[in-house]
Amino acid sequence: MSAPAHKEPESFAFDAESEAKIATILKRYPEGKQASAVIPLLYVAQRQMGRLTQSAWVPRVAMDVIAARLSMPPIRVYEVATFYFMFNMKPIGRHHLQLCGTTPCMLRGSDDVLRACKDAGGVKGVGDTSADGLFTLTEVECLGACVNAPILQVDDDYYEDLDYDSTVKLLEAFKRGERPKPGSAIGRMASAPAGPQNVLTGQGDD
């Protein structure tokens, strides 16, 4: 890894809450195979940073701690952390806006969601953090919920079937300190059809 442009903490230690999660995670792996837990532990580290600093990211020193815990070379942890886009290698805003811009979401209006993120979230574009530190906007790969496109993942939650107005409403709620209920902005049940008919009635023409 190249030298970071931001300030890295000098030390990192998992707190009691994180240690309890790690103990549960490591029980899933047989002796000698604990290195397979690198992704879950990276996630635990990122969640701890978000909980304690209001910015969910993984400092290099945390990766070193994970490497020591799992008895693996630090470079192997760096490789995993930098490969997956869900791990943040630098500080981000309080809320992470993760916009899917792949084909289904693009065809269903992700550009309008992006415009709303700029207008209501105060970000200049993808990769930017708002001046108040509340939002960071990232464009991500497919989130796997294409039938509910367009999708905006905020932190760990999916907000689906969005348009410009519903995205503005969503971000305004976060600005007020609220946590809107995840799911469809149009009241769709799970991935059911968007129209009024969502069951097979057996009536009408074949």
PLM features per residue range, with description:
Residues 1-206:
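Signature of N-terminal electron-transfer/Fe-S-associated modules in redox systems
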